[in-house]
Amino acid sequence: MDDNILVIGIAGGTGSGKTTLMNNLISRCEGMVTVISHDNYYKRHDDMTYEERSQLNYDEPAAFDTSLMVYHLEELRRGHAIECPVYDFTIHNRSEQTIHIVPKKVIIVEGILIFENEELRNLMDIRIFVDTDADIRLCRRIKRDVNKRGRTLESVLKQYQDTVKPMHERYVEPSKKYANIVVPEGGKIWWRWT
């Protein structure tokens, strides 16, 4: 492992502000950051129809190929490039594409459940949890999923009620205890001081 590589994990609920925090960190470390998103490690479901895939629970640990992400993060820490899978939210499946990712001085690992897995968590030097009110997270998720992922308002609300909220309470919120830093209010206050 390269001791000169810093791995920062950013977790938090859906719509909490993880991407905003990540982008702020990237802007302060320009050219030195590699990002690896847990979303790209959703399991492949080529054997299912779109309708079947749209009914899956994407907010539980079993939805992810976290062992592949652990392997990829270990490779990056060793100084090796990886071919990261790409998940397509519009079809609820991985695409055939990959992203060539090279290690840099800082690796940011981002996702709702990255602190839930001990093996993955132990590869991180700093663990940041973005803590945001549930109503704000829901509003952000609706806006994002309708505008960027081609979902209907009804499908977003159903998914939130059926899986997102219960899985947040079961897995995401409890994983906050593994954070070194908890950023309140989605980082709104924190960025005023930096």
What do the PLM-derived regions correspond to, one by one?
Residues 7-9:
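Short hydrophobic/aromatic beta-strand immediately N-terminal to the Walker A/P-loop
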Residues 13:
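P-loop (Walker A) phosphate-binding loop of NTP-binding proteins
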Residues 18:
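Conserved lysine of the Walker
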Residues 21, 25:
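Hydrophobic positions on the alpha1 helix immediately C-terminal to the Walker A/P-loop
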Residues 27-35:
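Post-Walker A helix-loop "phosphate-sensing" segment adjacent to the P-loop in P-loop NTPases
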Residues 34-35, 43, 47-91:
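Conserved nucleotide-sensing/catalytic segment adjacent to the nucleotide-binding pocket
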Residues 95-149:
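ATP-dependent NMP and nucleoside kinases share a basic, alpha-helical "lid"
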Residues 102-103, 165-194:
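NTP-dependent small-molecule kinase module
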